[in-house]
Amino acid sequence: MAEVATAEKPVTDGIQDGSEQPDRSLRFEAELEFVQSLANPQYLSYLAHNKYLESPEFLNYLSYLEYWREPKYARFLVYPNCLHVLKLLQYATFRKEISRPDFAKQLMDEFYYAWIKPSEAGVFGDDDTLEGLKREDSQAPPGQNVKMENKDGDGDVQMA
C-alpha cells in the first residue's frame, strides 16, 4: 500500500536523485485513492467516529482536494459521486450526521438508487439538499436537519 505524504513526512519513494521532493505520481495516486474513498459512506462514518471530520487540518486537506473537480483530474475518477460528498463535507451539519448509522445507510441507499436508475434519482447532494445544509448548518440538533422522502414507493429513501 502506498505511503501517504504529510507536511511533516513527504513521500520520497521512487525518487532517483535522493532529493526530498515527493514523488508526484505517488502523491497523485494516493490523493486519487483517498478522494474516491469519500464515495464510501461507511468510510465517512469511520472518519466521523474517529474525529477526523472535526480536525481543522483534515478539513483544510478536504478543501485542497477540490482540485479534483477540474476536468483534467476528474477524468480519472471511477466514482464521481465522491465529488458530491466532497462538497457535502464542507458543511458541519453533514459532518455530524454522517456519524449516525442510519444516515450513512441512507446515503449508501441513495448512491445505489442513483446507480441503478440514474435518470430517476435525485442524487444526494443536489442543489436543494445543499441549500438546506447551508441554512441549517450548525443550527439544528443531529437527526433533525435533513428531511427524507420516499419518492418511488419501493422503500428506497430519497432526499427531499
Swiss-Prot record:
UniProt-annotated stretches for the region Disordered: 1-21, 127-160
Subcellular location: Nucleus
GO molecular-function terms, A-Z: transcription coregulator activity
Gene3D superfamilies, per the entry: Mediator of RNA polymerase II, submodule Med31 (Soh1) (1.10.10.1340)
Assembly and oligomerization: Component of the Mediator complex.
Family, per entry: Belongs to the Mediator complex subunit 31 family.
Reported function: Component of the Mediator complex, a coactivator involved in the regulated transcription of nearly all RNA polymerase II-dependent genes. Mediator functions as a bridge to convey information from gene-specific regulatory proteins to the basal RNA polymerase II transcription machinery. Mediator is recruited to promoters by direct interactions with regulatory proteins and serves as a scaffold for the assembly of a functional preinitiation complex with RNA polymerase II and the general transcription factors.
Name the UniProt record assigns to this protein: Mediator of RNA polymerase II transcription subunit 31
Organism field: Yarrowia lipolytica (strain CLIB 122 / E 150) (Yeast)
Taxonomic lineage of the native organism: Eukaryota, Fungi, Dikarya, Ascomycota, Saccharomycotina
Gene responsible for this protein: SOH1
